[in-house]
Amino acid sequence: MKIRASIRKICEKCRLICRRRRIIVICSNPRHKQRQG
């Protein structure tokens, strides 16, 4: 899980989701997991 100020989709399978007032990226590739912090 990478924590970044600005997150973006890395590939086509990445999905942006809002959870508990946080924006996270979920992907089939575990390296693409991100969270805004």
Swiss-Prot record:
Molecular function as annotated in GO: structural constituent of ribosome
Main location: plastid
PROSITE patterns: RIBOSOMAL_L36
Single GO biological process annotation from the record: translation
NCBIfam families for the chain: rpmJ_bact (TIGR01022)
Annotated HAMAP family: Ribosomal_bL36 (MF_00251)
Family indicated by similarity: Belongs to the bacterial ribosomal protein bL36 family.
Protein name: Large ribosomal subunit protein bL36c
Organism: Epifagus virginiana (Beechdrops)
